[in-house]
Amino acid sequence: MAAPLRHTLLKLVPTLLRSSYVAQVPLQTLCTRGPPEEDAPSSLPVSPYESEPWKYLDSEEYHNRYGSRPVWADYRRNHKGGVPPQRTRKTCIRNNKVAGNPCPICRDHKLHVDFRNVKLLEQFVCAHTGIIFHAPYTGVCMKQHKKLTQAIQKARECGLLSYYVPQVEPRDADFGTVHGAVSVTPPAPTLLSGEPWYPWYSWQQPPERELSRLRRLYQGNLLEESGPPPESMPEMPTTPPAESSIEQPGSQSA
C-alpha cells in the first residue's frame, strides 16, 4: 500500500513544479520605466566662454593647462592594435554623455569652435603651407573636424585668418609672338601666284570626246557653243542717282 502511494506522489511532483514555473512573473514587468533621456538633466558642465570663446585662450587657466603648445599636442589616441585607424570616431558626445578618452576639443568644455576664435583655428592649420591638418594627425573626432574646416573657411572669407597665396612670376615666353600659333599666318602659295584656291574654281576645258557626244545628243536643241568665260567682267559706268536726275532735265532743256 505504501509503494503505490509513493509512486503516485512522485508522479504529482513534476506537475506541481511545472505549474509553479508557469506562474512565475518576469522581473522586467515589475520594473518601473525610468524618465526619458530628453527630460533628464544634462551631465555636461556649462561653459562661461560660450558666447565669447576667444577669451578662454587668453585666460590664465588656459596657459596653466596647455602652455604655449597646441591643444592636441599631448593627446594620444586609444585604439586596438599597433596601427591606428585611418579615421577617428564620428563623435565623442552622444546623448549628453562623453565617451572615454574624448578628442582634444570635446574633452575641454571651455573650447568652442568658432570662426572668430582665430587663435584656436591657427593651431589646426599648417603655418608653412596653410593646409588644414587631418583628423588622425590632431586626433579630433570627425564631427569637430567638420566644424573646424567650416570655421576656417569662413574665417578666411571674412579676413580674420590669413592664408598663403603663391606668387608666380610670369615668363616672357608666355607672352611672346615667337610661336607659330601666335604669329600671323602666311598666305597660301596658290594665292600668291594668282591661281584659285581649289582647282575646280578655274575653267577646265572638257575633253573633245565628251563634247562630240553632247553635240550628237542635243543636236536639235543646241543653238550655240559656249566658250571659256572672259577673264574679267566688263565694267559698267556707275553714276550717282542725284547727278543722273540733274542731267536729265538739262538735256531736255537743251
UniProtKB/Swiss-Prot annotation:
Residues 227-240 have a biased composition (Pro residues). Belongs to the bacterial ribosomal protein bS18 family. Mitochondrion-specific ribosomal protein mS40 subfamily. Keywords: Mitochondrion, Phosphoprotein, Ribonucleoprotein, Ribosomal protein, Transit peptide. It is found in: Mitochondrion. Transmembrane segments: none annotated. The modification Phosphoserine is found at S47. One of its GO terms (molecular function) is structural constituent of ribosome. It comes from the Eukaryota. This is Small ribosomal subunit protein mS40. SUPFAM superfamilies: Ribosomal protein S18 (SSF46911). Residues 1-33 form a transit peptide. Gene3D superfamilies: Ribosomal protein S18 (4.10.640.10). Component of the mitochondrial ribosome small subunit (28S) which comprises a 12S rRNA and about 30 distinct proteins.
